[in-house]
């Protein structure tokens, strides 16, 4: 989990004993170590937001072959392909004048796709999604010529520093410096990691968004003061319920419904991947044997919203809202067991993935899979 190295370390004594480290690739990692409880657990923390731009730099235009392809992959995983041509051809970018002119032609073609917005400066084309998701990145592949059509991608926000500072009470506060690209410019944010209260059940107090601001007062539909997130697609929790993402414009957003308690910030995903399943079989262990998980029970504590599946591309969302819950407000956190059909295939690993994509609490106590093993 330390990959190629750690550039900085610090220790948090309370409320949990965690050794924090900053990796040289800008990820924050932690090692929770509680000897008396026999707890030794590594964890990674990828912050909301993005750093870097998706760009294409055009060079040596005269030798870009006819039919060279560029593939843009949106934050939701869907792709769009653009193709070059050495003569005027509808639906392709032309390579007939110069590096700069070729870049302009490429920009014009990408701009014609409603999913993207492109700008050009000299021979560099910068691309953004028109309506990006609040999580995920825009990436580029130059399938046939990565030299003459060089690219850069959007990437995760970069953690540059971490520090633990004692507070007036018994807990310690963890502070980080996060580097993001905001509205085309590099910005650094000084933020602290919220110490989660596991006993809190008031939906309006939940804070599971990065660089977030809160509003509490009379019912409103406009939330302002968001200049630090200008141009960003933000996650929203309104009156304890999830709300469709919005893009910050002129430092504000407009809600779909009036609300009295609102949290607005950069969304992130929380993902759990189990180790390879080690269960019994008729002939010893199930390790290395073909198996299929067909149902799983997930035991939760004060949680709302969870997906489970065999891979991140095949997840099943577990329902929490019932006919007894009012439709115009958030639902209370759930404690107990949720059983769900597991859409798994036969394989030898038996991995289980659990994911939270909403700004809501998720505490997993245990997972109980039911499976069939072929001996």
What are these regions (language model features)?
Residues 1-51, 55, 146-375:
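Beta-sheet repeat architectures centered on beta-propellers
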Residues 51-151, 256-257:
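Extended, beta-strand-rich, solvent-exposed assembly scaffolds of outer structural proteins
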């Amino acid at each position: 989990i330390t990959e190629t190295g750690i550039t900085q370390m610090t220790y948090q004594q309370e409320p949990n004993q965690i050794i924090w480290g900053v990796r040289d690739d800008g990820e924050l990692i932690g090692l929770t170590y509680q000897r008396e409880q026999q707890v030794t657990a590594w964890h990674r923390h990828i912050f909301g937001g993005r750093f870097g731009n998706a760009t294409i730099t055009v060079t040596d235009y005269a030798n870009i072959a006819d039919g060279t392809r560029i593939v843009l992959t949106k934050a939701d995983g869907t792709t769009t392909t653009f193709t070059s041509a050495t003569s005027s051809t509808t639906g392709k970018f032309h390579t007939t004048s110069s590096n700069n002119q070729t870049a302009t032609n490429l920009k014009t073609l990408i701009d014609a796709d409603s999913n993207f917005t492109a700008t050009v400066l000299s021979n560099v084309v910068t691309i953004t999604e028109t309506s990006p998701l609040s999580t995920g990145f825009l990436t580029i592949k130059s399938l046939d010529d990565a030299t003459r059509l060089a690219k850069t991608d959007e990437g995760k926000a970069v953690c540059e520093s971490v520090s633990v500072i004692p507070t007036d009470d018994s807990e310690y506060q963890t502070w980080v410096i996060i580097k993001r690209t905001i509205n085309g410019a590099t910005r650094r944010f000084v933020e602290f990691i919220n110490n989660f209260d596991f006993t809190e059940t008031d939906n309006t107090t939940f804070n599971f968004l990065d660089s977030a601001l809160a509003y509490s007062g009379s019912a409103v539909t406009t939330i302002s003061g968001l200049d630090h997130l200008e141009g960003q697609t933000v996650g929203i929790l309104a009156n304890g319920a999830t709300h469709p993402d919005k893009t910050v414009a002129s430092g504000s957003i407009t809600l779909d419904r009036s609300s009295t308690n609102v949290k607005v910030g950069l969304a992130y995903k929380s993902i759990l991947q189990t180790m390879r399943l080690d269960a019994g079989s008729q002939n010893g262990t199930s390790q290395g044997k073909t198996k299929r998980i067909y149902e799983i029970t997930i035991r939760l504590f004060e949680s709302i919203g969870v997906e489970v599946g065999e891979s991140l591309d095949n997840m099943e969302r577990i329902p929490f809202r019932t006919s007894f819950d009012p439709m115009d407000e958030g639902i209370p956190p759930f404690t107990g067991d949720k059983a769900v059909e597991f859409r798994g295939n036969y394989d030898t690993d038996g991995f289980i993935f659990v994911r939270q994509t909403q700004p809501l609490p998720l505490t997993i106590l245990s997972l109980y899979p039911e499976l069939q093993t072929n001996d």
